[in-house]
Amino acid sequence: MRLALAQINTTVGDLDGNRARILARLIPALGATPEPAPSEETRLFFEAVARLAPALSTVRALARHLRVRPSTLMSRFHRAGIPSPKTYLAGMRLLHTAFLFQNPGLSVSDVAYRMDYSSPQSFGRHLRAVLGVTAGEFRRRFPFDVALARYIDLLITPYREALRAFHPFNAGSWDQGPSAVAVSRAG
């Protein structure tokens, strides 16, 4: 039991270090000086996704943590012409998976459960649906650095300009929560 707890604690600490490695490459890929830097909100979105991805698998749960309605979040991404928040979340979960697979002592089942899948079979179905590969193939073909480069190449670089100007949390009068002033409708 003590060994199992030590492995879990090590994995949690490792995922924190992994988050730092992801952000160290992802944030500069969004753009830096002399180009306009990404909006603070865009940076915060990616920091939140990197932090929350191992435990969250739905946009609804992500939106709850970000204190934005899921439909509002998805609408903002669509209007900005960038991939959906689900795409960014699913990709980030795959990055964390690739990181865990670097540990030869972790089985596919271990990784599936640590990434909060209900079963190794569910995890395998997800990999096959998203990438068309088995968990074993994913482990061999997508080591962490390859997976991170692919994430940046597919989800950041083509949308760099839109992401720099993007404001995913820009709350309007409709989604500021229960403390917002009521909107009156003349009529």
Feature locations, PLM:
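Helix-turn-helix/homeodomain-like alpha-helical modules used for DNA recognition
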Residues: 121-131, 135-136, 152-187
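Basic/polar phosphate-binding segments, predominantly the helix-turn-helix DNA-binding elements
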Residues: 56-88, 112-137
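Hydrophobic structural segments
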Residues: 1-29, 37
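Short, leucine-enriched amphipathic alpha-helices that occur as contiguous helical runs
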Residues: 38-46, 90-94
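Linker/hinge segments immediately adjacent to helix-turn-helix/homeobox DNA-binding domains
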Residues: 20, 27-43, 53, 57-60, ...
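Terminal helix-turn-helix DNA-binding modules in bacterial transcription factors
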Residues: 79-118, 141-170
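Basic, amphipathic alpha-helical hairpins
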Residues: 30-34, 44-58, 77, 81, ...
